[in-house]
């Protein structure tokens, strides 16, 4: 009987490695616009996002947005929107990727409180749905 990895490989799925942090978050490495970054894989985040400090780092063209973000204990957070970026996770790529840009300091403060390195952003359900992701913890 074939195992899950062989089955998914046959269906053209691409394997993307992740690390489980001390906080039980999943950490994945990726690239936005060709620039490397570290991201939390956030199944509860509806949209992928990065912090304001990452605008230049990832070469984003971020524009004002009237949308307010909420999550991880915060609400009414000011946002910007960066459209049409390229994301690469492992060998999986998407060239029309939109990002929410907001103040991620509360996320990174929580990580550093547990002696975990800060992250550049969160990969959300938008990417997971687009890539038809299957998360295998084994």
Language-model features: where?
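Pepsin/retropepsin-fold aspartyl endopeptidases
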Residues: 1-138
